[in-house]
Amino acid sequence: MTSKVANTEVAQPYAQALLSIAKSKSLTEEFGTDARTLLNLLTENQQLRNFIDNPFIAAENKKALIKQILSEASPYLRNFLLLLVDKRRIFFLPEILQQYLALLRQLNQTVLAEVTSAVALTEDQQQAVTEKVLALTKARQVELATKVDSDLIGGVIIKVGSQVIDSSIRGQLRRLSLRLSNS
């Protein structure tokens, strides 16, 4: 069993518990916003991630930091994270938050479209991608996760679940190369 699978298995019940709390208090969207913000913070700030992941740092120090960072967040979310520290599961926080967001998308009939482009997409281009994904998936909403990869040369790659739409120039060149080598 890989580490990622193990992390997902540990994270799933905690994410479901967090969703249950959020639903009971009608705070699902607020928790979603806070989860996205916290995930971005953990991704961008390696020192914070190292602090939270370090088993040698006292739980009280981690709790103090969580209280400081989440001073404006819902007390239910803050208490949930403090419980993760007590249960020594705070290491799984990114996976728990990602699982929560996946459950929230499922609840809201929203699909996640991971869009990779050669250059940053304009608002109009993002809207066009959103409309295309809505038409393909029949979902009620689309959540776009965009990233830039200049190796694509041009075009975009859209990934929704296990479905991938590759309209990048790099992908077209690769397909052309395969056809030429098979000829």
From Swiss-Prot:
Gene3D superfamilies named in the record: N-terminal domain of the delta subunit of the F1F0-ATP synthase (1.10.520.20)
Source domain of life: Bacteria
Keyword S-adenosyl-L-methionine belongs to the record: no
Entry's family note: Belongs to the ATPase delta chain family.
Role played: F(1)F(0) ATP synthase produces ATP from ADP in the presence of a proton or sodium gradient. F-type ATPases consist of two structural domains, F(1) containing the extramembraneous catalytic core and F(0) containing the membrane proton channel, linked together by a central stalk and a peripheral stalk. During catalysis, ATP synthesis in the catalytic domain of F(1) is coupled via a rotary mechanism of the central stalk subunits to proton translocation.
Subunit structure, as described in the record: F-type ATPases have 2 components, F(1) - the catalytic core - and F(0) - the membrane proton channel. F(1) has five subunits: alpha(3), beta(3), gamma(1), delta(1), epsilon(1). CF(0) has four main subunits: a(1), b(1), b'(1) and c(10-14). The alpha and beta chains form an alternating ring which encloses part of the gamma chain. F(1) is attached to F(0) by a central stalk formed by the gamma and epsilon chains, while a peripheral stalk is formed by the delta, b and b' chains.
Protein name from the UniProt record: ATP synthase subunit delta
